[in-house]
Amino acid sequence: MGQTVTTPLSLTLQHWGDVQRIASNQSVDVKKRRWVTFCSAEWPTFNVGWPQDGTFNLGIISQVKSRVFCPGPHGHPDQVPYIVTWEALAYDPPPWVKPFVSPKPPPLPTAPVLPPGPSAQPPSRSALYPALTPSIKSKPPKPQVLPDSGGPLIDLLTEDPPPYGAQPSSSARENNEEEAATTSEVSPPSPMVSRLRGRRDPPAADSTTSQAFPLRMGGDGQLQYWPFSSSDLYNWKNNNPSFSEDPGKLTALIESVLITHQPTWDDCQQLLGTLLTGEEKQRVLLEARKAVRGNDGRPTQLPNEVNAAFPLERPDWGYTTTEGRNHLVLYRQLLLAGLQNAGRSPTNLAKVKGITQGPNESPSAFLERLKEAYRRYTPYDPEDPGQETNVSMSFIWQSAPDIGRKLERLEDLKSKTLGDLVREAEKIFNKRETPEEREERIRREIEEKEERRRAEDEQRERERDRRRHREMSKLLATVVIGQRQDRQGGERRRPQLDKDQCAYCKEKGHWAKDCPKKPRGPRGPRPQTSLLTLGDXGGQGQEPPPEPRITLKVGGQPVTFLVDTGAQHSVLTQNPGPLSDKSAWVQGATGGKRYRWTTDRKVHLATGKVTHSFLHVPDCPYPLLGRDLLTKLKAQIHFEGSGAQVVGPMGQPLQVLTLNIEDEYRLHETSKEPDVPLGSTWLSDFPQAWAETGGMGLAVRQAPLIIPLKATSTPVSIKQYPMSQEARLGIKPHIQRLLDQGILVPCQSPWNTPLLPVKKPGTNDYRPVQDLREVNKRVEDIHPTVPNPYNLLSGLPPSHQWYTVLDLKDAFFCLRLHPTSQPLFAFEWRDPEMGISGQLTWTRLPQGFKNSPTLFDEALHRDLADFRIQHPDLILLQYVDDLLLAATSEQDCQRGTRALLQTLGNLGYRASAKKAQICQKQVKYLGYLLKEGQRWLTEARKETVMGQPTPKTPRQLREFLGTAGFCRLWIPGFAEMAAPLYPLTKTGTLFNWGPDQQKAYQEIKQALLTAPALGLPDLTKPFELFVDEKQGYAKGVLTQKLGPWRRPVAYLSKKLDPVAAGWPPCLRMVAAIAVLTKDAGKLTMGQPLVILAPHAVEALVKQPPDRWLSNARMTHYQAMLLDTDRVQFGPVVALNPATLLPLPEKEAPHDCLEILAETHGTRPDLTDQPIPDADYTWYTDGGSFLQEGQRRAGAAVTTETEVIWGGVLPAGTSAQRAELIALTQALKMAEGKKLNVYTDSRYAFATAHVHGEIYRRRGLLTSEGREIKNKNEILALLKALFLPKRLSIIHCPGHQKGNSAEARGNRMADQAAREAAMKAVLETSTLLIEDSTPYTPPHFHYTETDLKRLRELGATYNQTKGYWVLQGKPVMPDQSVFELLDSLHRLTHLSPQKMKALLDREESPYYMLNRDRTIQYVTETCTACAQVNASKAKIGAGVRVRGHRPGTHWEVDFTEVKPGLYGYKYLLVFVDTFSGWVEAFPTKRETAKVVSKKLLEDIFPRFGMPQVLGSDNGPAFASQVSQSVADLLGIDWKLHCAYRPQSSGQVERMNRTIKETLTKLTLASGTRDWVLLLPLALYRARNTPGPHGLTPYEILYGAPPPLVNFHDPEMSKLTNSPSLQAHLQALQAVQQEVWKPLAAAYQDQLDQPVIPHPFRVGDAVWVRRHQTKNLEPRWKGPYTVLLTTPTALKVDGISAWIHAAHVKAATTPPAGTAWKVQRSQNPLKIRLTRGAP
């Protein structure tokens, strides 16, 4: 089955030298690449039967040659040498071609489908297929193909195909049957036959037809059928890739099988069913049916032809006939085409881009893989010369980085071929360094880098030491010298020694260490100066200070201080932690310098607690213990013979401990010995269970974890943060330990996250913490199943009072990571001493990963499942790595602990022996103290809360509330206590700590000190919940019966939401019960709950009042509280406010429904029924409506016939607010009377009866906590409800049409409110502004014009006050009005209408003279408004000038068409203004050269030279080239106004028509080639009737549009054209009957008068900016008009004509308002004045 298939194309490529020789004999030259392209891709598209593998059939070659030599644009002259050479190969075949050429091939049809009939010819195909052609009567001698020896029929080791003879037709075979029988010779069977197809008969030696397997000639001369063997199908299936993996390889296999075996239709189905899946087979069959061609050689979709050529069901083809075999041959060809089409992958350039060169891959192998990717994932042929550039670029960019960089730097890269690039890449590849050389180079670079860094560090250290000693040596010289003299017993400084002088005996010639007089005995013990002295060294690399010195612990680290009574402040030399912002100057012998203080949050313990802050002086040689700390310690310095001793006031040695505030609670923990100490027995019996004896754990039953990533995740690489030397040295031992244990391993990963060194509090030890936040974002989220500590202890019954607590050490490291997930957690680490410089990653589950707790918790639960089953009497609680084992007796606890330790050891987990609490009755677990079935708060946690200082910032307050909130279960009413504190925690709120906050702060601390013990929930007993409510806070206690007593389980408290807090007390109790029941469910775990409260709320829940509760809230409460299986209500009890437990004495219960009914309304006697003996019966109404764009509102109180009160309300008042005002006014006017008031407003009615009381109790807040609308009006209404003696507010329908009293009164009130809204002044006394005497200047200056105007208006003069009065107001003079309004407008820049409305709404105390005229003048003369405001001027339409005959006047324009296929992005459109005829040309550029070219080459030859051309001011038209061409040709080129498309309206409208038509055509045809569809769009434009009912075609040619039926079979009748004389007569008629009337009509339009614009020469105008930026005025100017036309004008300063629609008039102040210059008394000053208009 491994035979290679030989085709004519492959045969020519194998003998390419002979092919070139034959081509040279034909005087042509051929190239191998183009030879393959033409044969496999080009010639099969000619539809003449040329196969992709080539053929030597002369008939097909002749047809291809005729297509190649076709004259005109359809020919292919570049293919002539190749088809001529191929024809020469067929006519004069060389020896290697002769076996594949028929002696005399008959002419072949153009289509592969054979017509029926005995004389039908077979379809053309490759010569390797059996040539089923009729034999020639004069049969030539049989060629000697095979040797006479009995060799195999087909040699499987050679590539040459077997010879095939000619196949005779059916009729010829019948006529020559006898001759063939007599002349046939039978050859001996081949030994290879059995190897090929099993038991097959040898073929007839003299047979004239070839054998088409599996059809064989039997002994009686009949064809027999031989199916595929199962071994063949099995080998083909298993030894080849699937169709989806490599479609090309499987297609080649099936093609070879179709050629060599000649299967029938059934065999083909069997072959496809074996090698392909169902979906692949369906796709192949569908593609094969698409390849069926009709009689015209084109693909067909006719069902009959498709089913005939490629049937889906078994056909009745007779394989013994020529017609049946031809059908079968065609079926195989179509099947092969379907395989090829179905195997084509969709274009995916990303796959090609993903092919990169491997580290050790040669460039040649990489290029082959790249080409294969091009063939598989793109439709491009990588061997095509046109694709060589793309392949070359991909080869460069996707090569190895070192090769790619060097290839990019090649000189003259554009001229390099792909072969040149491969050769250069091979040179670079061969010169690469070996892996050993690369490792050696990297090692040398690392060593050099480390050596440089080490030298730099040493140099920097030496410089720092030198500078420090130089600056501070003189500072302490006196102290050091004096102390040395004290030790030596003298007061003089010892003399200077020579270089060779002994310091002991003062003799020369030796040193002190070699002095013979120096005693050699053992050194005596040093005197102890402190109990906490751990050594003499004061710091790393520092000599101990001289005596007297004392060693103290600072932050857990021993520091040796020099006692310096001359130092005012104590000094630390090394970084003690965080430094404060305070600093101080230190004056020394060498000068002064500023140093910082440490923070004062340090607690020191010696004789007492003190707080101290050190001075941080890193340049000081030794730490100093100054007078400040000596004073606080009450230290005593005694001078003895051995030196100075520093002790406390009682004579004891001093000891000082410094630690952080968060670890302070550990000081208060009592170190109590456990009842059963963890001795050597537990350690020795279970060595594998303890981390101290068993080493690092490993969960043996857990498979390595695979961490799934999100679908869109990509690797993240974050560089390592800079790390100090101290931190690096601190975490180095931990990294080394983890590397030795195999938990960390070196790696190379695209992922990288930084490592953070975290300093352990109280020590100098660091631990490594990895920042995995970015990795956590890219990992899939899993649901967290870690238990909730809040209710975890609910599963611990009080009967189990013996406990064992185990803490698993390094728990996460017990779980392994899968190798595929390990690169996610890589980080950088460099350690030159260990030879590590790169990345490390975790092989175990790391800490800091978001899913680590859940994964470990689930794994440990699975591993401990068997232990729980085997020990059902024990309780095992697990919170991640903290285990709690509880038992009823000590023996059961010890037995269970042993079993648990054995299980943990076997499973591979390790517990910490230091933290273990084994078999005790009192243990600490999760921050609680468990003892005797109860849980307590630990004293350490209480002390932590008590020791916190008073908060000074919101953050400190949040920390306090968080710490105290952990203990809220022990504090009754915690929510109510902390209520004053929570508002200060919000961001943006002023932190104002007052007495209320201090009181709450102290109450919480006091409650915490008196916190009781809480019993553990017993899930076998029912729970009781006592609930109380006070001022919107729900409080409760959850209890369980313990004998005759109730033992508290938890104290619950919560604040109610704003809606529930505004309810009556009984309903607030319902809300409180619902809130606390939900919280208690977390502890009761669904057990029965009995609710006891001082209210009978069960009846309220069953029948809640609909006026207070919404439906959603009512349903929620009923579903929670009426679940009788879980919740039951107990009797009504009175609770103790302190303990929330029932009181001994019982109070009389109250009726909640009755109390609730009483609280529904604000006024008890308020009713909605008329009062019979009422004093007044009034009707109220309020209205709000829009009038002239302004909302007007009014309100009224009326009877049936008269208006009691009415008034206008401020503009913008809503109808609801107006109704409230009207009702409130009626109540005020009926004070002390009996009143019936009718209103048609449901809003006002419900507010008075129901909602008002609800709003008041709620604090006038909505359910979201926001202030309600109309708050002031609602408050006024609630206050006015109590004014009448008796009151009835009745609701009546609005807009009634009846004649009842209600209808008449409602209509009267509605009409009165509407009339009141139209008034200008509000008359209601409740909303009147108190009248006040307006401020009057000392005097008003009235001009003569003002006085004349005042007399005309009838004003009176007030002699007392000295001003004129009109309408009861002082009159402001015209000049003062101008100054006031001008200032107001400059502040607001409002329009005249808005300024009038503003002045009308804000009632002025003055009467402004000529106000409206002054407002108009001020706004019109404002320069800023003129430059910004839009213009409302409307310019009349002009008249467009048209030509008097076709071709004389054209409009031209460019329009852009996207997408720009083939480089065509623009369309140049010409429109004849006379006829509307359009010419459009696609162009690639928008230039003047293109315009001139189309004008001279297209417009001029067809229509003559235009007289006028119109266009916009585009660069292609306004350029010097276009204008010069127009001048030379005598064309009057008119450039239209800029930014005025209406000026070129005809061509602009045609642009839109053409683009709309192209859009429709592209949608209908499915193509994006608009250039191809442009003729159809032009046809539509030219044959569309215009405004006069004629199409441009009719105007131009004088004939109707050529609308014909293109599908009419009698279309030939329309081809008879009339004579030339008839055409001329028709044109003459058109000129007389069409052109002249059109020209006259156009002239009439020009003669009609056009309304000109109002601008004249000399006017000042503003010109519009067509392109404005941010904060830039819309208009520029003003400019002076120089010239005008009916539609345009030219201004001074702008060269182009401007359309009249783009300008607006500029108002200039009259001469009287110009600025005037006046002299003043000061000669250096002048006065500028301007009068009013």
From Swiss-Prot:
Compositionally biased region (Pro residues): 108-121
Cite the RNase H type-1 domain residue spans from the record: 1172-1318
Zn-finger segments (CCHC-type): 500-517
Where does the Peptidase A2 domain lie?
559-629
Alphabetized GO MF terms = aspartic-type endopeptidase activity; DNA binding; DNA-directed DNA polymerase activity; RNA binding; RNA-directed DNA polymerase activity; RNA-DNA hybrid ribonuclease activity; structural constituent of virion; zinc ion binding
Q: Which residues are annotated with the PTM Phosphoserine?
A: 190
Record-annotated Reverse transcriptase domain positions: 739-930
Residues bound to Mg(2+) 1 are 807, 881-882
For this UniProt record, the keywords arranged alphabetically read as follows: Aspartyl protease, Capsid protein, Coiled coil, DNA integration, DNA recombination, DNA-binding, DNA-directed DNA polymerase, Endonuclease, Host cell membrane, Host membrane, Hydrolase, Lipoprotein, Magnesium, Manganese, Membrane, Metal-binding, Multifunctional enzyme, Myristate, Nuclease, Nucleotidyltransferase, Phosphoprotein, Protease, RNA suppression of termination, RNA-binding, RNA-directed DNA polymerase, Transferase, Ubl conjugation, Viral genome integration, Viral matrix protein, Viral nucleoprotein, Virion, Virus entry into host cell, Zinc, Zinc-finger
User: At which positions is motif PTAP/PSAP motif?
Assistant: 109-112
Q: Which residues bind RNA?
A: 721, 771, 773, 787, 851, 853, 1054-1055, 1082, 1184, 1186, 1242, 1266
Supply the PROSITE patterns for this chain: ASP_PROT_RETROV, ASP_PROTEASE, INTEGRASE, RNASE_H_1, RT_POL, ZF_CCHC
Pinpoint the Integrase catalytic domain residues: 1442-1600
Record: residues binding Mg(2+) 2? 1181, 1310
Kindly state the positions of the motif LYPX(n)L motif in this protein: 128-132
Matching entries from PANTHER family are given as: GAG_P30 DOMAIN-CONTAINING PROTEIN
What name goes with this protein? Gag-Pol polyprotein
